[in-house]
Amino acid sequence: MKQPFQSYRQLFPVLSSHIHVGSCSQGAVSRPVSAAIEEYHRSLLQHGHNGDLSMARLEEARGHFAKLIGAETDEIAVLSSASEAIAGVATALPYVSGKEGIVYADTDFPTVGHIWQAQEMFRDHICCIPSIEGEVIIEQYEEHVTEKTALVMVSQVNYTNGFQQDLKSIADIAHRNQALLFVDAYQSVGIIPVDVKAMGVDILVAGARKYMLGIPGVAFLYVSKDRIDRFKPRLTGWLGQEPASRFDIAHPVPAAGARRFETGLPSFISIFAANAALKLLLEIGVTSIQAYMSELLDFSVEHGRRKGLHIRVPYRGGTLPSLLAVEVADVSAVERRLRSQNMIVSARKDVIRVAPHFYNTAEEVRRVIDELAGRC
């Protein structure tokens, strides 16, 4: 299999000594990202203050993320984590009697349930859809999303097995019931093309450290400009206010657009890193990345099955997973053994996740699968 991004591999120093297929947890750090981190450090070290430069990088990152998902810049908020973003939305969603239902699935990342169950006004109106062999199918959303539903939360990609959801179909179901669609795209942005307008997404969150190739400390929240006015954030701060009221302690005025969800100063070093990572992804093109990844994951599934591995999600053509989830007896021990051989994978629950990115080769994935087959 041809590696179309061979020239980019030199940008990732870790690849010279390791096989890095743990992007579902932490993507490989590139030289441009490292240089951006050094720029932040150097500017602060040499000049003592870099506030103007940091805010400029924040606005650049906001614009790059908006472009990546097909949004407008004023529809993006920059926050510290996906959990903060979800909490911001949950605490700002207005309660309407008879229209207070919250729908999510048992396959969503646990923070989703933690946050929504902490909202007293919505707690008794939560519907957690039970998965069927790790999948939640469209017919289940048809059944559980009703005229009483206020918001449907969906993971575009399942964090344990890579199962991909059909967002447009779920958006149609939600909107038919006058509900909002809130997408957790942490496991998809950077490897799967996202167009929030075409997909009918109302709200979306994604952090930078996984397939976006950044580091922890920054997440992006998209809120459609057609939906923003219904939200009056209670989790807020001075950056969530209109500029004229930021230093008026008595008369706060929520900022226009998604910025109203911002709180205080973010981790600027993470912003610098995310900005560089986003520029790299935009240069390469996520559509091109997806085309290669489809081939690579197809190869991974086929080779894994030939080796007798038990892959969690059945490969059925149209539902090719975005990562390989391999069942093993002792995931932590297997993860440690692989890492001792410079193979970076990610253990989650009872599976080892093999999650390549555009910089990986078929040979690297084959070697990891062969090693897993020898230990399972």
Features from the language model and the residues they span:
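Pyridoxal 5′-phosphate
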Residues: 1-376
